[in-house]
Swiss-Prot record:
HAMAP family: DsbB. It comes from Stutzerimonas stutzeri (strain A1501). GO terms for molecular function: electron transfer activity; protein-disulfide reductase activity. This is Disulfide bond formation protein B. It comes from the Bacteria. Belongs to the DsbB family. Residues 1-9, 62-67, 162-163 are cytoplasmic. Keywords: Cell inner membrane, Cell membrane, Chaperone, Disulfide bond, Electron transport, Membrane, Oxidoreductase, Redox-active center, Transmembrane, Transmembrane helix, Transport. The chain crosses the membrane at residues 10-26, 45-61, 68-85, 143-161. The lineage of its organism: Bacteria, Pseudomonadati, Pseudomonadota, Gammaproteobacteria, Pseudomonadales. The gene is dsbB. Residues 27-44, 86-142 are periplasmic.
């Protein structure tokens, strides 16, 4: 049974990622929840996934191209899921063992090399460990991880489907 064409599945994945970013922006600008560094990395991964899916949907590639797009999208999913898992772990660490807060991104961009900025941001901060919102008992990074699992299913479906 054929559920969805490869192109329509890429469109659905793009729309799903656009919805996730819209929710993140709503939470930031309407609910007043400022994103931490790990949240920003997760947003970048969702945007990257969405852009790959959009390009794939516009291009409408054959079997090999579809798998290449799915593999590239899977890289964004893996990075985002790893970041969400890191943030979930930080939320379980006792407060006295959390990393200290970071200086502003503007300052770091002026004063530090890119590799050091990336290391500091991916390490996380006490700000990343704060649970500021929950729904159904799940925090934002847990919901984010659930979204990345859904994206991973799309990638696997596109990688493994037979024509």
């Amino acid at each position: 049974m054929r559920l969805a064409s490869p192109r329509s599945l890429f469109v659905i994945a793009f729309l799903g990622s656009a919805l996730l970013i819209a929710i993140a922006l709503y939470m930031e600008h309407v609910m007043g929840l400022a994103p931490c560094p790990l949240c920003i990395v997760q947003r970048i991964c969702v945007i990257g996934f969405g852009l790959v899916c959009l390009v794939a949907a516009i291009h409408g590639p054959a079997k090999v191209g579809r798998r290449v797009y799915a593999a590239i999208a899977a890289l964004f999913v893996a990075a985002g899921a790893a970041t969400a898992i890191r943030q979930i772990w930080l939320q379980s660490v006792p407060a006295d063992q959390l990393p200290s807060c970071l200086p502003s991104l503007e300052y770091m961009m002026e004063a530090l090399p890119f590799q050091e900025i990336a290391r500091l941001v991916l390490h996380g901060t006490a700000e990343c460990a704060e649970v500021s919102w929950t729904m159904l008992g799940m925090s934002i990074p847990e919901w984010s991880l659930l979204g990345f699992i859904g994206m991973a299913i799309v990638c696997l479906w596109q990688l493994l489907r037979r024509d």
